[in-house]
UniProtKB/Swiss-Prot annotation:
PANTHER family from the UniProt entry: BIOTIN TRANSPORTER BIOY
Gene name of the record: bioY
Keywords: Cell membrane, Membrane, Transmembrane, Transmembrane helix, Transport
Annotated protein name in UniProt: Probable biotin transporter BioY
Protein's job: Probable biotin transporter.
Record carries keyword Secreted: no
Main location: membrane
Domain of life: Archaea
Transmembrane stretches, start-end: 6-26, 59-79, 81-101, 109-129, 134-154
Subcellular location: Cell membrane
Length: 162
């Protein structure tokens, strides 16, 4: 990897970590800017480097570095009720990064879908399927679509594709 790529990967690890701290509690799954930076990482860095940046974020958190929401970290967060969302982040980043041009909106939404599906199924192990959907998916649909669309617009501006 070139120095610029290493720097960009590190930047998105940091941005995602900061985004996790901008949080509003609305149940067991907090509303944060993590999803925004997860999608933006894929759009700006592409699927491979985006995946790497968010995988590093997940690994740092699993190792106990307080990068998750509420300045938390540790393997318990990966194994706990919201762990599925965290596990899904690198996959969503990869999918979002596959998009170019107008397809970016679609791949960003597909990335969100992956986060929802994995997170919902994981959370359902703790609270049941219906309650997991009500707590862990439904309240996030509109805010996350707005975040994903904003990420696409910002990525296009950063890359000069207006």
């Amino acid at each position: 990897m070139k120095a610029k790529e290493v720097s960009l990967v590190a930047l998105f690890v940091a941005l995602t970590s900061v985004g996790a701290q901008i949080s509003v509690s609305i149940g067991p799954v907090p509303l944060t800017l993590q999803v925004f930076f997860v999608i933006l990482a894929g759009l700006v860095l592409g699927p491979k480097l985006g995946f790497l940046s968010i995988l590093i974020y997940d690994i740092l958190g699993a190792l106990g570095i307080p990068v998750f929401a509420g300045f938390s970290g540790g393997i318990a967060h990966i194994l706990g009720p919201t762990g599925g969302y965290i596990i899904a982040f690198p996959i969503a980043t990869f999918i979002a990064g596959l998009g170019r041009g107008k397809v970016r909106y679609l791949t960003s939404l597909m990335g969100l879908l992956v986060i929802y599906l994995i997170g919902w199924m994981w959370l359902a192990r703790f609270v049941g399927f219906n309650k997991a959907f009500i707590l862990g998916v439904l309240p996030f649909i509109v805010p996350d679509i707005v975040k994903a669309a904003t990420a696409v617009i910002i990525a296009e501006r950063l890359q000069g594709n207006t």
